[in-house]
């Protein structure tokens, strides 16, 4: 694998969302948002637990009503992952969920109310040591900024964000992160670039309302990838009109591709052609589903023929190179065995699980030695 220098991240202050550190060099946190009715406690808890299983660091929950706030109390008691309450329009809901142990408040300054209401929310957050996310969105800019700029622009999003950053500064509150989201990739990227030069608080990245599973993943990969490659961003959400679990998977895939943070298996697979000696696509799809529980970072190359297979296998944790009836299995760049093409999936799953256990044990021993 090419020896790329690590991305130099923007310096920022640190806050904590529950027990998850955000900013100041902490691992970039991946989060999602529930799409159940919050008042359906069972469904919401089940979805949050599903997000936890695929690695969500933080989960946001919409709390649109006081009934939802009461449901939030019950939800919080049944999950372990830190929860962010998404609050719009009614500041009193923010005060209520703060009583119930919320880990972070997300407010949209364009619709939460006047300065006095914001002050009440901030005072409550300070008293209970709850961080705030200032969530600026191109679709809900303040009316005066809409009139001033005519349309959402990077300068408009920046002015909205700075207006409320300044407000929190005047209230001597510094436990916050900021987002300036837009559905347009260029608008979002430039807004974040401008904001990154103005403040040193952590930045939450996102391309809002990005689209369905395919188009939304592409937009997010481009927008977030550009910013992350420049060292901008401390936490992220991939917004998809899809199962929230997919948001977490895509988020980790983006970080994995940039070598910022790895979780689970990085599959390297050829797009296939008539040279393939076994069903590459079927093998990859099956293994991705079967091995979702593996969190050990490792590269697995699955190549259908000998044209590129050996080269990819040399730089993979495990690699398969297609051959006639049997395919070569490489481990850490060394050819170890041959696998029957008719039983490829089961054999490879077993080898990957064994390798993951081996790597986990080696890391455990390393940690013990360091602690001594």
Curated annotation (Swiss-Prot):
Cofactor(s) listed: [4Fe-4S] cluster
Single GO biological process annotation from the record: terpenoid biosynthetic process
EC number: 1.17.7.3
Reaction(s) this enzyme catalyzes, per UniProt: (2E)-4-hydroxy-3-methylbut-2-enyl diphosphate + oxidized [flavodoxin] + H2O + 2 H(+) = 2-C-methyl-D-erythritol 2,4-cyclic diphosphate + reduced [flavodoxin]
GO cellular component: cytosol
NCBIfam families in UniProt: ispG_gcpE (TIGR00612), PRK00366.1 (NF001540)
Family indicated by similarity: Belongs to the IspG family.
Protein name: 4-hydroxy-3-methylbut-2-en-1-yl diphosphate synthase (flavodoxin)
Activity response to pH changes: Optimum pH is 9.
Enzyme type, top EC level: oxidoreductase
GO terms assigned for molecular function: 4 iron, 4 sulfur cluster binding; 4-hydroxy-3-methylbut-2-en-1-yl diphosphate synthase activity (ferredoxin); 4-hydroxy-3-methylbut-2-enyl-diphosphate synthase activity (flavodoxin); iron ion binding; metal ion binding
Cofactor note: Binds 1 [4Fe-4S] cluster.
Record pathway: Isoprenoid biosynthesis; isopentenyl diphosphate biosynthesis via DXP pathway; isopentenyl diphosphate from 1-deoxy-D-xylulose 5-phosphate: step 5/6
Binding site for [4Fe-4S] cluster: 270, 273, 305, 312
Function: Converts 2C-methyl-D-erythritol 2,4-cyclodiphosphate (ME-2,4cPP) into 1-hydroxy-2-methyl-2-(E)-butenyl 4-diphosphate, using flavodoxin as the reducing agent.
InterPro entries, sorted: Dihydropteroate_synth-like_sf, IspG_bac, IspG_bac-typ, NO2/SO3_Rdtase_4Fe4S_sf
Keywords: 4Fe-4S, Iron, Iron-sulfur, Isoprene biosynthesis, Metal-binding, Oxidoreductase
Effect on the protein of changing residue 335 to C: Loss of activity
Annotated consequence of substituting residue 322 to D: Loss of activity
Pfam family for this entry, one: GcpE
């Amino acid at each position: 694998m090419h020896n790329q220098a690590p991305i130099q991240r923007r310096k920022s202050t640190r806050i904590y969302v529950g027990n998850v550190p955000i900013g100041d060099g902490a691992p970039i946190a991946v989060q999602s948002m529930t799409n159940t009715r919050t008042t359906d406690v069972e469904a919401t808890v089940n979805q949050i637990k599903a997000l936890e299983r695929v690695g969500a660091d933080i989960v946001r929950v919409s709390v649109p009503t006081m009934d939802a706030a009461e449901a939030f109390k019950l939800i919080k008691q049944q999950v372990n992952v830190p929860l962010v309450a998404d609050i719009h329009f009614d500041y009193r809901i923010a005060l209520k969920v703060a009583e119930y142990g919320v880990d972070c408040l997300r407010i949209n300054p364009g619709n939460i109310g006047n300065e006095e209401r914001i002050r009440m929310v901030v005072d409550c957050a300070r008293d209970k040591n709850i961080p705030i996310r200032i969530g600026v969105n191109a679709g809900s800019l303040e009316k005066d900024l809409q009139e001033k700029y005519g349309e959402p622009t990077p300068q408009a999003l920046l002015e909205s964000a700075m207006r409320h950053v300044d407000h929190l500064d005047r209230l001597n509150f510094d436990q916050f992160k900021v987002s300036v989201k837009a559905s347009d990739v260029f608008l979002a990227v430039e807004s974040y670039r401008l904001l990154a030069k103005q403040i040193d608080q952590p930045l939450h990245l996102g391309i809002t309302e990005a689209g369905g599973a395919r188009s939304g993943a592409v937009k997010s990969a481009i927008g977030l990838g550009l910013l992350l490659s420049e060292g901008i961003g401390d936490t992220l959400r991939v917004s998809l009109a899809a199962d929230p679990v997919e948001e977490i998977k895509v988020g980790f895939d983006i970080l994995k591709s940039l070598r910022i943070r790895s979780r689970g298996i990085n599959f390297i697979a050829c797009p296939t052609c008539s040279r393939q000696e076994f069903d590459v696509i079927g093998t990859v799809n099956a293994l991705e589903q079967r091995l979702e529980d593996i969190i050990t970072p490792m590269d697995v190359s699955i190549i259908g023929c000998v044209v590129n297979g050996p080269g990819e296998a040399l730089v993979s944790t495990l690699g398969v190179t297609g051959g006639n009836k049997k395919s070569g299995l490489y481990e850490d760049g060394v050819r170890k065995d041959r696998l029957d093409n008719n039983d490829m999936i089961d054999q490879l799953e077993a080898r990957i699980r064994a390798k993951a256990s081996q790597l986990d044990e080696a890391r455990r021993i390393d940690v013990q030695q360091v602690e001594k």
